[in-house]
Amino acid sequence: LHERVRAVRPFGWGVIDVRLDQEDLANAMVRFVTLEGVMPDGTLIRILPSDLENGGFVLPRSIDGSFPPSLDHLDVLVGIPTERPGGPNWVLDEDAGTAPTRYVGMRVGIADLNSGEKREILLARENVRILFSGEDATGFITLKVAELERGAGGKVSIRDSYVPPCVSMSASPWLMRLVRGLLELLSAKRKGLAAQQLAASPASLDQARCSRLHILNAHLPLLSHCSLVGQAHPESLYLMLARLTGELSTVFPSLDPMDLPKYDHFNLYGTFREMDLRIRQALKEEDIRVETIALSLMSECIWQAAVSSE
């Protein structure tokens, strides 16, 4: 199934949601509170806060010894042992969690759907491990989910600007803020253009202004939906912004649609940061080259205005 989906959706893997325990992180310990995603090989992983009741789905790890002060940042990855042809690929023993098999046993209490009686059963679950940059990941399928950095006083925190490969833009607070920022900017531009159109007489409508207003009116509802729902795939968001940029290049010739950054699933921060800069620069160019000049009626059919030499 994964191979068939990948044929039509090559970027259908990545993080859906990830949260680290902030208290543990302050004590140099990496522990997942929530982790949902699709591994590059199509394996689904889902770790929820309720899993903590059973001692945690993934064993936490200390960063001591892995994150010296000389290191700019520390990559945090999750890994699952690759499937071994001929096995073994599972150990149905909850005490064998350190074995490098793809699946290990986990005892959980499950209520019967008919009687409601609760029983403890043994389930096989993915043997998800926490890995750090610089470690040997041979034999593991890995997904980089976060970057850690040191702040003032050596305090460890999550690097906000790192956007992991993801299947939902809500996986990255930074990406969500970027979309909201663009939405606010474009909405403000649209209101300004609409006010100018309403104030102008039918005989003095500006075709360039009409074109800009049309472009913004067509794209604002789509960006608004992405911002509210947050479930769009990053590639879908990229195509949306690329189309917006292409249409803006009609009224801003300095904006070359063939010079846009390429979509990079491994570097979403760089991709969308550059797209955001291109759009903002084009709109800023409009502010620079357009100036409102007040006219005063001198006599019939004669208007006068003071034009700055600049």
Where are the model-predicted features located?
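Terminal low-complexity "docking" segments
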Residues: 49-65, 305-310
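Extended, amphipathic alpha-helical scaffolds
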Residues: 225-310
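Elongated alpha-helical scaffolds
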Residues: 56-93, 99-101
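Basic, amphipathic N-terminal segments
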Residues: 18, 45-46, 59, 186
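N-terminal "first-domain core" detector
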Residues: 1-33
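Short loop/turn segments at secondary-structure transitions that flank enzyme active sites
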Residues: 43, 82-86, 154
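Mixed-charge (acidic/basic) macromolecular-recognition segments
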Residues: 100-242
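Type-3 copper protein
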Residues: 35, 45-48, 71, 77
